[in-house]
Amino acid sequence: MGNIFGHLFRISTFGESHGGGVGVVIDGCPPQLEISAEEIQVELDRRRPGQSKITTPRKEADTCEIISGVFEGKTLGTPITILVRNQDTRPQDYDEMAQKYRPSHADATYDAKYGIRNWQGGGRSSARETIGRVAAGAIAKKILRQVANVEIIAYVKRIKDLEGVVDPNTVTLEQVESNIVRCPDAECGDRMIELIEQIGRQGDSIGGVVECVARNVPKGLGEPVFDKLEADIAKGVMSLPASKGFEIGSGFAGTLLTGIEHNDEFYIDQNDEIRTVTNRSGGIQGGISNGENIILRVAFKPTATIRKEQKTVTREGEETLLAAKGRHDPCVLPRAVPMVEAMVALVLCDHLLRHHGQCKVL
């Protein structure tokens, strides 16, 4: 249960961290979309482990295989299956964790729910599960670009107490990818890299905030009440491993303002379009996109699996100590950037198809 996401553009991910492989089945993709494994690989390469000195040293090529749903370079309208085979597995690193629970990880809760768990790398609770999301997100991004010229860019906004100065309205992908931490503020990015390296040498971890902007989103996406656009985006990004907080537009800072300070006043632009002077709503009003940039932020906690010794308990209920082995990110933020983009793309693509199906028929 809980392995399916979306309504019309639906995905189901599969696989475990140290099993044979991971992947995704995509249902509801429109036919005749030109797509290649190479295009999907670009996004997977941004997510893959071992890409820099501040990520996990696990070495995986994460080469994707399109198993079904694409013929002669075009989607068929049938389910698309994408598989990435695991190569650099070391299940023996987790032998101790077969009995000892990692603090703040899913080990104890999976056992409490199912009475059994894959303790080799966390199984489905591993961030390796997100490979399927990023692969599907690559296809969703292409649909959004082709239909509405939608552009989705995420970046590292903050690591611990180091916060970059970035304008989400003008930031470019080239700026994001200009350094290994994926912070467009180059000077702050250098300090972030130094901090992550320092924390990693100590066997510890740190968290931070990813900010994301979606530009050129058509007006009208989102459904009233329970399927509001920001609610579905929140569900998508909050389902990512290690995510602990979400805000959109002014977010929690908006609670410090009065109504006259917070309201986005309307005006008519040179193209006779209704626009807003400010964008504290973050591009969504009443759960429906208003045509302004959608701007959101996701908080990620420090990686739970660390080499520092911690108090814990065993499956048998005995108190003990654990200094975790294995290969893990000292900070998940640089690799979380394409994950956030993927989830936002999946939600927007799903709502685009739903909107066209309901409101563009007659």
UniProtKB/Swiss-Prot annotation:
GO terms for biological process: amino acid biosynthetic process; aromatic amino acid family biosynthetic process; chorismate biosynthetic process. PROSITE patterns: CHORISMATE_SYNTHASE_1, CHORISMATE_SYNTHASE_2, CHORISMATE_SYNTHASE_3. It comes from the Bacteria. GO terms for molecular function: chorismate synthase activity; FMN binding. Keywords: Amino-acid biosynthesis, Aromatic amino acid biosynthesis, FAD, Flavoprotein, FMN, Lyase, NADP. NADP(+) binds at R47. The keyword NADP applies. One of its GO terms (cellular component) is cytosol. It holds the Pfam family Chorismate_synt. The keyword Ribosomal protein does not apply. It catalyses: 5-O-(1-carboxyvinyl)-3-phosphoshikimate = chorismate + phosphate. PANTHER family: CHORISMATE SYNTHASE. Homotetramer. Belongs to the chorismate synthase family. This is Chorismate synthase. The lineage of its organism: Bacteria, Bacillati, Cyanobacteriota, Cyanophyceae, Nostocales. The gene is aroC.
